[in-house]
Design a protein with these regions (language model features):
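Sec-dependent N-terminal signal peptides
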Residues: 4-15
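Terminal domain-start segments
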Residues: 19-95
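Acidic, small-residue rich beta-repeat scaffolds with periodic aromatic anchors
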Residues: 21, 147-206
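Multi-bladed beta-propeller domains
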Residues: 55-66, 115-128, 175-180
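Beta-rich catalytic cores
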Residues: 69-71, 105, 129-131
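Blade-terminus and WD-like Trp-Asp/Gly-His loop motifs, strongest in beta-propeller folds
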Residues: 73-82, 133-139, 204
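Short, conserved, GDST-rich strand-edge loop motifs in beta-rich repeat architectures
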Residues: 85-103, 147-163
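Beta-propeller blade signature
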Residues: 99-115, 158-171
Length: 206
């Protein structure tokens, strides 16, 4: 009986080790709703833990003073740091008065101090990136994005939808946990997952 109890306890601990432990902000629920337009079964609790990694502080300070766009910044509550959608992104104003956003095939999510000094950067390849993000505490960010696993000639793709949990530790390190939900044969043209696609009042999307 005691042995059975220990086995059950270990199993319970293993299950909870990979359970979600992140606070998903209501500001990002639109992203879940967008995915539900192609898969009604998707829920936050369906995302499974897939990876834990760390990002170290930049070895040398890099200033981006006067090179960043305010609309791409989100400040933490204390106001001493901000996260930046993509440090490679640029904005162009169109004749309509709205903006188009462009950048490199690869993207980079950055965290800066109030003087626009780059503290941390998370690099993504051309198939992977962040759609939107939100501070939930002064030292914690929840971000959402996707990774294109396979692309097919008919225009469909197998996608890992990803929730990122960024925890900024004292001592110059960020712990990143990733939670994924896979959907096969997705027509990405039917989805508006990037936050700029939700702001038709400000942006024009190609």
């Amino acid at each position: 009986m005691k042995k059975l109890f220990i086995i059950l306890l270990i199993g319970f601990l293993n299950i909870n080790l990979f359970a979600q432990d992140f606070p998903f902000p209501p500001e990002l629920k639109w992203w879940i709703f967008e995915i539900q337009s192609i898969d009604k079964n998707v829920k936050i609790e369906n995302f499974k833990f897939s990876e834990k990694r760390s990002i170290l502080n930049q070895d040398a300070p890099i200033s981006y003073k006067n090179r960043l766009y305010p609309v791409l910044k989100k400040w933490n509550y204390f106001g001493n740091e901000f996260a930046y959608y993509d440090i490679y992104a640029s904005l162009e104003k169109n004749k309509s008065g709205k903006y188009s956003i462009s950048g490199e095939p690869d993207t980079a999510f950055g965290i800066f101090d109030k003087n626009e000094i780059l503290l941390f950067v998370d690099f993504f390849g051309s198939s992977k990136g962040i759609d939107s993000f939100c501070w939930v505490r002064d030292n914690r960010i929840i971000a959402v994005g996707r990774d294109i696993i396979n692309s097919y000639e008919d225009g469909l793709s197998d996608i890992d939808f990803i929730i990122y949990d960024y925890y900024i530790k004292n001592g110059g390190e960020i712990i990143v946990k990733e939670y994924t939900y896979n959907i096969k044969s997705v027509n990405m043209a039917k989805l508006k997952l990037r936050w700029v696609e939700q702001r038709s009042d400000y942006f024009e999307n190609n």
